[in-house]
């Protein structure tokens, strides 16, 4: 599996985007103005993928071009639907796949949806939605940052300010 980490500039901020990929993207990590966050989150993503794929991954650093896909999605050069063609979904649960597809196809740039609204649409609990959103391995492409709490729109892993930044880049303000 190839690990690619690139630095981009968005709204006077350094955005670090990392992808783990083969023919498609298996996972994405990002940070804003904090390259050490990427280094810290890489092992967590690898561990998640190894558990889901039930195998030890051999990671090599290289250039896959997939960080560019994530960046272009972030700045609106390509849609989430177009970018989603590049992600590997075979290891997702049926529920995760359903939720992530819904987000990609229905919650567009500049829009948000609450956990409760999404739960109602998917006929499940807000807690189930929250858990699946939190473990989303494809942030930015699968726009989990567009799912907000009714009382606090900026709850987010890894950091609330990341969610605020992503939503502002997309033109949404609370």
Swiss-Prot record:
Record: active site: 144 (nucleophile)
Gene Ontology BP, a term: DNA alkylation repair
Localization annotation: Cytoplasm
EC number(s) from the headed UniProt entry: 2.1.1.63
One Pfam family, short name: MGMT_N
GO molecular function annotations of the record: methylated-DNA-[protein]-cysteine S-methyltransferase activity
Lineage top rank: taxon: Archaea
Catalyzed reactions: a 6-O-methyl-2'-deoxyguanosine in DNA + L-cysteinyl-[protein] = S-methyl-L-cysteinyl-[protein] + a 2'-deoxyguanosine in DNA; a 4-O-methyl-thymidine in DNA + L-cysteinyl-[protein] = a thymidine in DNA + S-methyl-L-cysteinyl-[protein]
Tagged with keyword Oxidoreductase: no
Principal cellular location given in the protein's record: cytoplasm
Gene Ontology CC entries for this record: cytoplasm
KW Cytoplasm (keyword) present: yes
Keywords recorded for this protein, A-Z: Cytoplasm, DNA damage, DNA repair, Methyltransferase, Transferase
Protein role: Involved in the cellular defense against the biological effects of O6-methylguanine (O6-MeG) and O4-methylthymine (O4-MeT) in DNA. Repairs the methylated nucleobase in DNA by stoichiometrically transferring the methyl group to a cysteine residue in the enzyme. This is a suicide reaction: the enzyme is irreversibly inactivated.
General remark: This enzyme catalyzes only one turnover and therefore is not strictly catalytic. According to one definition, an enzyme is a biocatalyst that acts repeatedly and over many reaction cycles.
Family membership noted in the UniProt record: Belongs to the MGMT family.
Protein name, as recorded: Methylated-DNA--protein-cysteine methyltransferase
Native species: Pyrococcus furiosus (strain ATCC 43587 / DSM 3638 / JCM 8422 / Vc1)
Upper lineage: Archaea, Methanobacteriati, Methanobacteriota, Thermococci, Thermococcales
Gene label: ogt
């Amino acid at each position: 599996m190839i690990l690619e980490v690139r630095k981009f500039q968005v709204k006077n901020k350094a955005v670090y985007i990392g992808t783990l990929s083969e023919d498609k993207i298996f996972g994405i990590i990002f940070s804003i103005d904090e390259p050490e966050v990427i280094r810290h989150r890489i092992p967590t993503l690898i561990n998640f993928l190894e558990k889901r794929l039930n195998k030890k991954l051999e990671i090599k650093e290289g250039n896959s071009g997939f960080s560019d896909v994530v960046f272009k999605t972030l700045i609106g050069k390509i849609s989430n639907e177009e970018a989603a063609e590049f992600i590997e979904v075979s290891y997702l649960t049926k529920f995760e796949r359903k939720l992530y597809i819904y987000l990609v196809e229905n919650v567009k740039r500049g829009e948000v949806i609450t956990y409760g609204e999404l739960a109602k649409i998917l006929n499940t609990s807000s807690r189930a939605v929250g858990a699946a959103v939190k473990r989303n391995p494809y942030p930015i492409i699968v726009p989990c940052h567009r799912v907000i709490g009714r009382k606090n729109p900026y709850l987010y892993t890894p950091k609330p300010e990341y969610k605020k930044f992503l939503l502002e880049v997309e033109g949404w303000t609370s």
